[in-house]
């Protein structure tokens, strides 16, 4: 990342994986209670921010299918501007590589990177807790990226506790299908009563010989998604013939973990040509973690 008084360039908005995802209940307002472990990846969209003196917030990159006014990045910048009353504006460029509807947190991570970067560029110096409170207004996953550490998540995803995870390499395969999260949450066959676990349960398993992402819990959404979307089911089956695999979030991406980059790249090389695969290393901390205190 490059840093100056008038711009911040090459700011990574890291993807996330759900190492497991349990749905433990449903609230009267329709929201679901979840338990999950969020894993940051050293892979994602890249954002560039340039200070404007006229107070305008402008996205200067076209993002197909996402109007500027509804883009979470623009909404995040305007939210921060309104909250603080700053006179500054910003031009935002986005190098978009994460697919939408993939369960990788792309839009949420972009929004969080925007809040963190503008906290620095606009010299606001807001504390992390205040940024997290703003982030909730943008989506349930955004506070995690502001939190900035791998985390055990509960509630609707906003109750976060840091977890230490070993370094791993992941192969992430994304079928050419968009899975609407709301559709999966509303499916009548979705499991909503998984017995709650504790962070101690997860950590004990991680330190055992079997401590691998596929060996704790499950993704409660995976059965519904693979029933509805044959492409996702095909990826899960193909990867399972190579190594244990699991869907992240509400899909459509599926991941497998490896001890080394070489192993992950070797598996990627065997993918069918029509599939989109990426190899990424785990992260322990958001690249912009120090932009909030």
Curated annotation (Swiss-Prot):
Pfam family, one: GHMP_kinases_C
Keywords: ATP-binding, Isoprene biosynthesis, Kinase, Nucleotide-binding, Transferase
E.C. designation(s): 2.7.1.148
SUPFAM superfamilies assigned to the protein according to its UniProt record, in alphabetical order: GHMP Kinase, C-terminal domain, Ribosomal protein S5 domain 2-like
Pathway linked to the protein: Isoprenoid biosynthesis; isopentenyl diphosphate biosynthesis via DXP pathway; isopentenyl diphosphate from 1-deoxy-D-xylulose 5-phosphate: step 3/6
Residues annotated as binding ATP: 99-109
Annotated catalytic residues: 16, 141
Molecular functions (GO terms): 4-(cytidine 5'-diphospho)-2-C-methyl-D-erythritol kinase activity; ATP binding
Family from the record: Belongs to the GHMP kinase family. IspE subfamily.
HAMAP family the record matches: IspE
Class of the enzyme per the UniProt entry, highest EC level: transferase
Its job: Catalyzes the phosphorylation of the position 2 hydroxy group of 4-diphosphocytidyl-2C-methyl-D-erythritol.
Descriptive protein name: 4-diphosphocytidyl-2-C-methyl-D-erythritol kinase
One GO BP annotation of this record: isopentenyl diphosphate biosynthetic process, methylerythritol 4-phosphate pathway
Lineage summary: Bacteria, Pseudomonadati, Pseudomonadota, Betaproteobacteria, Burkholderiales
Catalytic activity line of the entry: 4-CDP-2-C-methyl-D-erythritol + ATP = 4-CDP-2-C-methyl-D-erythritol 2-phosphate + ADP + H(+)
């Amino acid at each position: 990342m490059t840093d100056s008084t008038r711009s911040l360039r090459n700011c990574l908005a890291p993807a996330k994986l759900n190492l497991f995802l349990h749905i433990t209940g449903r609230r009267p307002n329709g929201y679901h209670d979840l338990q999950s472990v969020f894993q940051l990846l050293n892979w994602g969209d890249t954002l560039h921010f340039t200070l404007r003196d006229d107070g305008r917030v402008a996205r200067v990159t076209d993002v197909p299918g996402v109007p500027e006014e509804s883009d979470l990045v623009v909404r995040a910048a305007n939210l921060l501007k309104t909250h603080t009353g700053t006179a500054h504006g910003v031009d935002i460029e986005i190098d978009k590589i994460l697919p939408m509807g993939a369960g990788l947190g792309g839009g949420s991570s972009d929004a969080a990177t925007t809040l963190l970067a503008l906290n620095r560029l606009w010299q606001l110096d807001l504390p992390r807790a205040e940024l997290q409170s703003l982030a909730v207004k943008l989506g349930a996953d955004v506070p995690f990226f502001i939190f900035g550490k791998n985390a055990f998540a509960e509630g609707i995803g906003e109750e976060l506790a840091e977890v230490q995870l070993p370094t791993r390499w992941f192969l992430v395969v994304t079928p050419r299908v968009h899975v609407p999260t709301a559709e999966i949450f509303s499916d009548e066959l979705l499991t909503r009563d998984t017995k709650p676990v504790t962070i101690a349960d997860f950590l004990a398993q991680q330190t055992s010989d079997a401590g691998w992402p596929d060996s704790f819990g499950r993704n409660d959404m995976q059965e519904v998604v693979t029933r509805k979307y044959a492409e996702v089911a095909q990826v899960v089956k193909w990867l399972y013939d190579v190594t244990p695999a699991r869907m992240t979030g509400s899909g459509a991406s599926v991941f497998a973990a490896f001890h080394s980059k070489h192993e992950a790249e070797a598996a990627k090389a065997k993918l069918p040509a029509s599939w989109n695969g990426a190899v990424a290393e785990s992260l322990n901390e958001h690249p912009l973690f120090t932009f909030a205190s």
